[in-house]
């Protein structure tokens, strides 16, 4: 796809028969594009991925037809997960994706961060926020939702005491300690009862 193009044809020189150019002579011809302007779609290789080290998915931005210049696809992120904390492109944030002139697709990695914090399953919504170059546009609203499945166990709470008996005198005390089996991503409140 190149869009409509123009060709300007002019007289370069005239020779023979005593003829000469009458002023500056040129004609403009419009070449009407017969291809539709390309549209961009966004897909992902799977909609769920475990938070295990080394796992990744492939995001693909695809043009419906070739463009004669680079097409830049601006990426947006949302969901319950946080880009650069819960996932990256393997080295950092998922940047704009560029489909080079003459090509129809480009890819980016989606790599979850394997941490030791229990967060539960999280979602990442990767969307197209804009398209520029090659007269291309987004095909409707393009977004993919990825579930990052938690690989840590939900934390459990244990209760311990510094002593099992205490004197009833003034100033006597003992310490109760509530311990989580692993780190949680939010405060955990332990309500005590007697």
Please give the residue ranges for each predicted region.
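Short boundary segments that mark the start of a structured unit
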Residues: 1-194
């Amino acid at each position: 796809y190149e869009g409509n193009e123009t060709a300007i044809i002019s007289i370069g020189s005239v020779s023979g028969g005593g003829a000469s150019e009458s002023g500056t002579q040129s004609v403009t011809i419009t070449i009407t594009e017969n291809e539709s302007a390309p549209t961009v779609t966004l897909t992902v290789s799977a909609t769920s991925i475990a938070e295990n080290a080394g796992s990744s998915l492939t995001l693909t931005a695809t043009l419906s037809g070739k463009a004669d210049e680079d097409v830049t696809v601006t990426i947006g992120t949302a969901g319950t997960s946080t880009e650069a904390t819960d996932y990256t492109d393997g080295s950092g944030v998922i940047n704009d994706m560029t489909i080079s002139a003459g090509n129809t697709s480009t890819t980016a990695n989606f790599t979850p961060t394997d941490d030791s914090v229990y967060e539960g399953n999280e979602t990442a919504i990767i969307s197209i926020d804009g398209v520029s170059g090659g007269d291309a546009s987004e095909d409707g609203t393009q977004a993919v939702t990825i579930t990052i499945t938690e690989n840590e166990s939900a934390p459990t709470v244990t209760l311990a005491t510094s002593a099992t008996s205490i004197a009833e005198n003034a100033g006597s005390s003992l310490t109760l300690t509530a311990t989580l089996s692993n780190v949680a991503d939010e405060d955990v409140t332990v309500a005590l009862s007697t």
